[in-house]
Amino acid sequence: RANPLPRVANLAGGFTDPGSREIGGVISTAVGQLSFLDHPQIAAFLSRSTFDFGQLRTEPMTVYLMIPPNELNTYYRFARLIVQACFNALSVEPKPGDRRVLLLLDEQAQLKYMETVVSAIALLRGYKVRIWSVFQDLNQLESIYKERWESFLSNAGVVQVFTTNDEKTARYFSAKAGNFTGTSLSETTSTSAGS
């Protein structure tokens, strides 16, 4: 009987050919991307759990994932895995009475590019989830998310800006804020001794 999907069979055959360099490249990439799982503490952490990120909706709690700065380059993939697991758990319709959830992604640039973060910022709002992304400046945000960097700002419920030390960030938010002339009234009362 003839194969109904010859194109698929040919593509798959390229991976099963022992002389194929493609399968070696795929395996090499997978091993590199999963190397953080070799760390004994991470393996132990991931081996079992009594926690479900869905509990963020039903119980008042705060969850912290902290990786020392000197370990971020090695374990950012682990942080990405945890953030993705959280997104997956919260991407279901909330039940009546479920709490709102705030996910604070401080130093989000350390996670590198995550397509799911771009989608989650817009989509999870409908599931009672707010994502608060913290970047150092617009250059950092744009270098990671390229042409999609403004999605973070346009989908944000609130944008906070502190100490703009680079010109691009200062100009961007100055233009967004527009012109405003304010007035203030003050009243002082003074008394002098001996009156």
List the predicted regions and their residue ranges.
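H-loop/switch region of ABC-family ATPase nucleotide-binding domains
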Residues: 135
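P-loop NTPase motor core of the ASCE superfamily
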Residues: 54, 119-122, 140-195
